[in-house]
Amino acid sequence: MESLQIYLIWSVYGVAIAILIAVASTFICAYQTPRDRSPSVTLICIISITVLLATVLLLPVDIALVSSITSSALGRRKSWATQAEVDKITFSLTIVYYSLYTVDALLCLIGIPFTYFWYEEYDEVAAEAGQQTAGQRFWAAFKYTLFFVAILIVLFLVGFFIPTSRNLAGHDSDFLRRLFTEDRGQHALTFSVGILTTLGLSLYIIYTSSGLARLPVLLMKTAPSFSSPSLIASTAMQLDSNRERQRQLDGRCGGDTALLSSKDRRELDSLVREERTLTRRQRLAEGAQEERRSWPIKVYHKMEAVLHPFKLLAGFVLLLAALFLWTSLCVTAIDKLMNSPCKHRCGYILERVNIFNPVNWVLIQSSRVFPVDYVIFTLIVLFLFCSSVVGIAAFGIRFLWIQIFSIRKGRTSPQALLLLTSMLMLITLALNYSVAVILAPQYATFGPQTFCDMPPVSSGPQPDCSRARNLIKSCSEKAENIGANGLCTPSVASTLLNQMTSNFPFFGAVFFWAQFIFLGLYLLVLVVSVTRSPRLDEHQLDEDAEEAEEERLLARTGRRINTA
């Protein structure tokens, strides 16, 4: 029976990975530009996003497996759950976790950079002329990637030799003591993942918090369309005004711009550039309006009008869900701040949950019927992931407040797609910590596990609470009953994350206080998004018009070449 249960749990995880592959593939194909696609870029992006999300979504499997050894109704271990079987389950989970974390680090620091340089090194003219071979391209990309290989090696070496914190005097317990029992290889990997998570937290704070606030509002508030009659009329008026001013300046100089003052010449040059922009904008808007008259577009807009109330409802539901998540994050953060026994010395670990956490309670109750908790947990993770994408799309990829790439559906370049994937990988690592340690700490540690709060009998049977159900209590990090320490099995994920924050208190302090910045920034962006009406991005519209004009010129040139 136990083998069948374990097999079913892993089967659900396999189905989840298949869904993740479909989600990642759809996401990448939807955002990449059709005219500049690279198979290597597409493949590495899909693999990276799938592996990262698979790492996060392993947590419910972890909870289900460690919880399967006990009966939550009786607070005792099942007959087959010997210590050897328990060790076998936790060891297999540990292997899977460390394998996934290793692949995550390799993809983030080596796989994506190499693919970026591999794409940049491609010279279409040289390749067609036979002057650039695959080996030359590989070596050129590898030389640039060596810098990231060096970073990875340095991280592992520092993590291998750096000492761990032992400053827990007066706060020792079996649970905390177990956090320090790891070998140096695990120590190095934990440190490396901690560094990447720290980098991801800065992105998580900026992009995920803003996206979490903006996503529901975007569904409830729709920006005006660039093909609307009012915009076309406004553009036509601006164009007429522009040309009238140009005629005035031409009349002033009789067609000879050399007779104009320097101020008037600058104004005329500016008017000419503005005229080109307005002409492209008008042509794009009129083309879009013409497309609206075709029957497929008419059907699409009618369906959009019919589904508009459901879109509003979805936005309202997502807003409630976001506030629900925000409340749970805030509650646990305050609980840890007030009740953690060792504070920053162990990463603000809680011995038990002291304040009611709604998300934590929902996940614990649903975990009694697997895979209900898996579905809820997956929806939460995908919601936060999509919020991160919305946040990045809103701000773009920036360096020192300078936008390098824009992220838009169907118009994202391969370079931007690789940078987007690396940012999402770092954000997902930070999300992994926030969900497991802050959003649902009790669920992520022990799940629905319980124990019978009776004094254990030495070398005798387990305590029986079948006639005293009031003595069946939920497992926690520190239970007063001695027998609970041997009965309650923490999840492997919580052990690894708590090892990270306990062995390296710097990580614990940064991870914890970053949550308050996240919560504050979410409220700020939410207030701004709700109070401000959506506007049409004219800069983005002008970029679309310029790209459309380039595509027309390329298509026209291609037809001339084919005709010749």
Swiss-Prot record:
Source organism, top-level taxon: Eukaryota
Compartment(s) of residence: Lysosome membrane
Record-level GO BP terms: protein localization to vacuole
Membrane-topology annotation of the record: Multi-pass membrane protein
Protein role: Probable lysosomal cobalamin transporter. Required to export cobalamin from lysosomes allowing its conversion to cofactors.
Family: Belongs to the LIMR family. LMBRD1 subfamily.
Record's protein name: Probable lysosomal cobalamin transporter
Organism whose genome encodes this protein: Aspergillus clavatus (strain ATCC 1007 / CBS 513.65 / DSM 816 / NCTC 3887 / NRRL 1 / QM 1276 / 107)
Lineage: Eukaryota, Fungi, Dikarya, Ascomycota, Pezizomycotina
